[in-house]
Amino acid sequence: MTSHALPLGTGARERALVQPAIDGLFLATILFVTFAKVHWQLAADLSLADVLTALFLVVFLWDRLERADARLTRTSVVALGFFAAFLLVYLVGFFNLDTEQALTQWTKGMIKFVLHFGFLVAGVTLLARRAERFYWYALAAFCGGIALNALYGVVQLILAELAGANLDAALIEPITSRETGIQVYGVVGGTEEVFRPNALTGDPNHLGIELVIPLLVLTPLYLRLERGHRLRTPLAVLLVFLLVVELATLSRSALLGLACGTFVLALPYRRHLRRPAFLVPFGAVVLLVGTVVAARWDFFLTVLRVRTNTSAAAASPHFGVYGFVPDVLSSNPLFGLGLNNFAVYYEFVTGRPDFGPHSFYVALLVESGIVGAALFAGFVIWLFRRLGAARRIGRALTVARDPLAARVRPLAWGFTAALVATLVANLFYLTMTFYYFYVFAALAVALPVVFGRRPRYG
């Protein structure tokens, strides 16, 4: 094993968990953040990750109070400023609520917001105080949780296809008392059901968009690993697996985002796309998918035609949702209809209690108006600026011939590509209100804090 193995950290003998209770809850929250089906209806719809977050925040704040330690990094202060600004927007939006249902939705949304953005602030603060190795553990927990979700989805799909069985009925429903299962997209030939795995996310599009993150974050890291590195083969296998599951979700939004994110990565890593390290795993995906498709050609051809239908009738619902914006802005232009009330308005307009075609950006404008949308744009710009700082650190490390450059720069590019992909995928879907995006944001903005604090230059 080379001396540059992941994690490439500050001291080989440092304790993995400095404060086991705080660090363990932090990593557990990240690991389970995409397990949306594991949730319970209490004061709000709380997932397992929400419960772990509440425990983490209580222990974290108690520790800080006990130590009389109020120190924050500059990044944490900025994150706290965004928290206060969003909170102010949502509190002003409270006065636009006009029904009991709207108030209930606002309350649920506020509980989620405080937990999730609170985790972002506390998470960045914690990562800034831990060794580089701990950051790698956090990244592994995040990507590992999504990978476990994908594995669950594969088992879910196999059982549905071969035995008509519902994996959720055996594993999830006894815990949550909620009836869930794989999505049945339709029927081909009157007899063959088309299944789309949703794993533990609750929706195949959610699974597909979340899978984009480890695919884009880990690919540049994998491509820069030294020959013979102990993680090179496991990462290649993992990326092949994740891409196959991505395709199985049949999510057009996810594939659109993945294509845009791949374009971002192709700019700095285009030379790697002609090398065996990329071509062999990609060829394995093509061979595996091609074999499965060839075995059921007529079935998959029918599904592909439906999923790539660009007729006006098929496309209009996805673009039609943007028609909500002028109507809402004409009545509540500055602060919208109130936090978490897009679902209420959607049902009012369409008559559908379950979401049809929708968009994060439409929901953003409907719920928080022009002010909220402008604030979120500022938040995204800040994320890009922090990732830009991480890339500059990577370049400086390269100039200084520091081996850590082979980790930091690819990671910064991977996060940048994943952020672009997520933004694009949410044009016609809605996942950026979910908890996983706050965890992603925490890892992204902490990147230059964690790897830019030690003197390495010159």
Predicted segments with their positions:
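N-terminal hydrophobic segments of proteins, predominantly signal-anchor/transmembrane helices
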Residues: 20-40, 53-122, 291-292, 422
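A conserved mid-to-late transmembrane alpha helix and its immediate loop/hinge
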Residues: 199, 203-205, 243, 323-326, ...
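A juxtamembrane structural motif centered on a specific transmembrane helix
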Residues: 1-23, 396-409, 426, 430, ...
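A membrane-periplasm/extracellular boundary helix in multi-pass inner-membrane enzymes
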Residues: 151, 157-163, 247-249, 266-310, ...
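Long extracytoplasmic/lumenal interhelical loops at the membrane interface
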Residues: 195, 299-368, 389-395
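Alpha-helical transmembrane segments of multi-pass inner-membrane proteins
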Residues: 118-122, 136-269, 381, 385-392, ...
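Loop-to-helix entry and N-terminal half of a specific, functionally important transmembrane alpha helix
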Residues: 25-31, 233-242, 388-428, 444
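Transmembrane alpha-helices of multi-pass inner-membrane enzymes
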Residues: 27, 32, 54-60, 259-262, ...
